[in-house]
Every structure is written in C-alpha cells, then in structure tokens.
Amino acid sequence: MKLKSLIKSTSDWFSSTPERALNRAYKSALKIQEIETKHFRGQKVSRENADYGASVITYFETEVQSYLQKINMELTVFKASRLFLSLSNLQDTENNLGTGKVKSEQETTAIIIFDKLKFIDEVIAKYKSNAIEKNVSNNVAIIAASERNPEVTNSAPSGKKSTKVKDQGVKNKTINFESASQKTGVLPRSFMNTLNKIKQEIDPKSGESEEQVLTKYRKSRYRTALSIKFILLLIIIPLLIHQLTKTFFLIPVVEQYFSRHEQVIFINRDLEDEALEELQHYEETLHFRGLIGLGPELSPEKIEQEVKQKAGEITEEYRRHGIDSIANIFADLFSFIAFVLVLVNSKKEIEVVKSFLDEILYGLSDPAKAFLIILFTDMFVGFHSPHGWEVILEGVAHHFGLPENREFNFLFIATFPVILDTVLKYWIFRYLNRISPSAVATYKNMNE
C-alpha cells in the first residue's frame, strides 16, 4: 500500500511538471513586463526608453537577463517533460477520446497554455535573443580570437579592438584554443616569456600596456569562472541524475519485481555465502555467551527462535542490497548518458577548460611537475599499486552486486597499470620533453 502511494505521488509530481515549469516562466515574463511598465513606459528595457543613469540601466538589464534565463530554462523543461508525458500517456488519451468531459478539460487547458506561451513570446521577442547566452558566446569568441591572434588585440587602436576581435570571431565558426602544449619553438618558452615581459615594461606606450593588462586580467577571470562552473556542472549533473533516477524510478520498479518474486533473495552466490556465514556466527555467539555467563543460557527452542528472527533480518538486509545493486547499474548508465550529453553540448566550454588546465599544469614550476608525475605514477603504477587496484575492483563489484572474480582482478592488475605507465611515458617523451626539458630532467633525478 505504501509503495502504491509513493508511486502515485511520484507519478502526479511528474505529470504536473510541464504546468509548474510553464507557470514559473509565465511569472518571470510578468516580472519583465512589470519592470517595463513601471520604469520604461512599457517599452523594452534599454537606455533609449528611459532617462536613468548608467548604473540604474545596468541594474535593470541584469534583472531582465536573469528573468530571460529563467524563462528559457523553464521552457526547456516544459517542452521536454510535455513531450515525455505525451508519449507515455498516448494510450490513455486514445481511450478517453470519446469522453466529452475529458475533451472539454483538454481544450480548456490547451487554451490556457496557448495564452501563456503567447504572452511569453511577446515579452521575450523584444530582446531578440537570450542576453546571457549571447554574452557567453561573445566572451568565448573573444578568448579564442585573442588566443589565436594576439596581434588583433595588441596592435589595434583602442577604439577598434572590439570590432576586430568580433569580426575575427564571426569569420571563424570553430574555436580552437592554442594550449600551452602547442606553444613550442626553438628557444625555451620561459626565456621568450621573460623577453616579452621586459619588452612590455619598457614600452613607451604605457597607456596601451595598462589596457592590455586589464584586458588580459578580465579574460583570465572570465576563463577561470567559466572553467570552474563547467567542471562543477560535470560533477553535479551526473550525481543529481543518478540520485533522482535511482530514488524515484529505479528502486520502486526493482522493489516491485522483488515483491512479485519472493523466492529471489540473493543476486549472486557470494552474497548468499556472506549471509550464511553471518547467521552461523550469530548462532555461535548465542551459544558462547550462554556458556561463559555473559547472557542467559538459552534452550534449543529459544536459540532457534532467535536465529529465525535474525535470519529474517538478514534476508531483508540482503534483499535491500540486491535492489540497490541492480538500481545502481541503470542509475550509473543514466549518469553516464547525462555526462556525455553535457560534453556534446558544451564544445566551447571544453575549449576554455582545456586552455585553463593547460595554463595551470604547464605553468607549474619544474619541481612541482616532477613531484606530481612521481606521485601519480607511484600511486597508480608503482610497486604498491596492485593493492590499491584490488580494493578499487572489489568496491566496484560490491557497488554493482557482482561476484568477486579473482582471475579477472589479477588479469586487470597485470595489464591496465602497464598500459597506463606506457601512456604516461609517451606523454613525457612526446610533449613534456619539448615544452619543459628541465622538468623531465628534474623528474629523472628525483626518480633515481
């Protein structure tokens, strides 16, 4: 009964998702209209439609951009959830097609949805496109253009810099960041950086140099913020998808299967052996405590009753473990799909993150690089790494409810660390040796 109530409440919550999302988008559109009516004579929020100062205009533009972002997000949720519900409820719609009351309610709901969507479109049509997405795209294009052609921003007059950068971003549809690993030449990179720094400091055009420093700082700050945000999204979204799908969808389905097949208790032989060993240990503990006087001496009937009660608890515990293990398999699959979708739809952000990580890793001192390489190799491919890999494999098997396979574990430990060590050595020889030869020399000395 409790399971049915939970499934019904969850189903009702999913069914009302499109309505909730549309209402939130509608309220955000009302907020934008309220700002336009009160402060901009019912027109678009811009400098041309009001006599406020720059700070006030910026404040209202930020508010509108925030509401536009909410509207776009809620409309995306509305479309996706409505499509999913329309596919899942197709049969119910066909069965109730002839009911006049149901048909009338559907028509009324459709009219309400149409009116709200029409109002939302009228509000956001004034702003042509999402201001926040446009700002992000422009910033990414500026970073990419300046990384590819530094002379675009360095040599142009201050009044024409933004125009040239923007034109460069329009001409190039794909953004290719020049990572630190690609900046190689005849002279060492540190030597060239020092010369460039001295040249900039003695440049008589000090005003232009200061502007370049500010531009570089803004670009670096934006790149750092975008990279951290994207990395957090890569972590949070799969975890959130995992918990939501497992809690509200997978576990109820698997529990329903186990309730129909009560004879299924253990999903593999290892779990059964663990349960029997635990039950046997409990029975022996009762005998032992009675013999040494730590507990009352129990009769065989009483011991059997206690063991029977413990067997019921163990059965419930291992059934729950089996349910969680099966749910983990599909929840991890959904998480992986969400992770891949985020990567596929974030190509620009990936370019920014790659450039950000390259600057951090290749900007470390030579001893720091050597220390991190030695730490990584000793941890994953060193002498003591087989014990760590064995613990990881046992944890993965327990997570998915798989029986432990010693032969597979030994085969994995004998091959995967070797492959990892080969890839690392190739990276040191192919890339690090060209970019930072002193770091490679330091690594060899520390490793010896």
Curated annotation (Swiss-Prot):
Annotated transmembrane regions: 231-251, 323-343, 372-392, 408-428
Subcellular location: Cell inner membrane
Keywords: Cell inner membrane, Cell membrane, Hydrogen ion transport, Ion transport, Membrane, Transmembrane, Transmembrane helix, Transport
Predominant place of localization: membrane
Pfam families tied to this protein: CemA
Any one Gene Ontology molecular-function term assigned to this protein's record: proton transmembrane transporter activity
Membrane topology label: Multi-pass membrane protein
GO cellular component: plasma membrane
Role of this protein: Required for H(+) efflux immediately after light irradiation to form a rapid H(+) concentration gradient across the thylakoid membranes. Together with PxcL, contributes to transient H(+) uptake following dark to light transition.
Family per record: Belongs to the CemA family.
Protein name: Proton extrusion protein PxcA
This protein's encoding gene: pxcA
